[in-house]
């Protein structure tokens, strides 16, 4: 029938009637569904943090993106020309502490610089970084029992769940396709 909402500024609560309510809240999807931690079960979402670094365009003096399919830890690395700059990414770090404005961990920046140094003629340095940004991927936990928290092996496919009360939850997918 709808949802009970609260105005963040006034704290006033009220009901909004709707024929369908869609939960597309990313890494917070389980929380909105009222999911509570239960021993022996997995939460709906396994949040994963992805970090990108921005450099001057001279790091990648081409109009083409470059993709390295295997880094030292069997992940991938890419460099993309973008808006006159070069983007290098990405990381895949499991997160439980979900901040509305996440920041890169020092180890993630170090990882990207170390891996990029293996592929670029002039290795980028920390002082070359123009900006960083972080995305939180709402990866859907695999249903197989005993699965670990290795987020790099979790599917990036989207999932749609429809509860008996009509709440439709859309989650999963790649951070790069979230819009």
Question: Which residue ranges define each predicted feature?
Answer:
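C-terminal catalytic lobe of FAD-dependent flavoproteins
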Residues: 20, 29-87, 93-179
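A generic structural motif
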Residues: 4-8
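A conserved short coil-to-beta-strand element within the FAD-binding core of flavoproteins
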Residues: 1
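Core beta-strand elements of the Rossmann-like FAD/NAD(P) dinucleotide-binding domain
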Residues: 10-20
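Glycine-rich, N-terminal phosphate-binding loop of Rossmann-like dinucleotide-binding domains
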Residues: 25-26
């Amino acid at each position: 029938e709808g949802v009970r909402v609260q105005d963040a500024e006034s704290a006033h609560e009220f009901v909004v009637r709707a024929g369908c309510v869609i939960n597309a809240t990313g890494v917070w999807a389980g929380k909105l569904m009222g999911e509570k931690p239960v021993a022996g079960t997995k939460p709906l979402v396994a949040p994963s943090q992805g970090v990108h670094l921005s450099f001057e365009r001279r790091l990648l003096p081409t109009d083409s993106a470059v993709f390295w399919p295997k880094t030292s830890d069997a992940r991938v690395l890419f460099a993309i020309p973008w808006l006159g700059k070069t983007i290098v990414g990405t990381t895949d770090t499991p997160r439980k502490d979900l901040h509305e404005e996440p920041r890169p961990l020092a180890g993630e920046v170090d990882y990207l610089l170390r891996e990029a140094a293996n592929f670029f003629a002039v290795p980028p340095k920390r002082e070359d970084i123009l900006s960083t940004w972080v995305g939180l991927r709402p990866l859907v936990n695999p249903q197989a029992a005993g699965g670990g928290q290795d987020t790099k092996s979790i599917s990036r496919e989207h999932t749609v769940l429809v509860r008996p009360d009509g709440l439709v939850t859309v989650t999963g997918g790649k951070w790069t396709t979230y819009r």
